[in-house]
């Protein structure tokens, strides 16, 4: 199984996340059989994330200093876009990142 992490940060755009969950979700249903086993999970430094236009998301996995090495097990890391600079660069300053 391939594992893909989508990193959520304050100000992320919902449609930028949806494109990945939709593509890989449909791939698991109608894609070529040898590529169907993909698991997508959302990760962040905190449980609740506020999106650009007021939506709120809950991360499936929370990154902490104690478990940061577990996140090296993902096969790919997706960093979706946000409005302007959003707050990705604030999260980028997090010493865990």
Predicted regions and their residues:
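Extended, subdomain-level signal for the structured scaffold at the beginning of enzyme domains
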Residues: 1-97
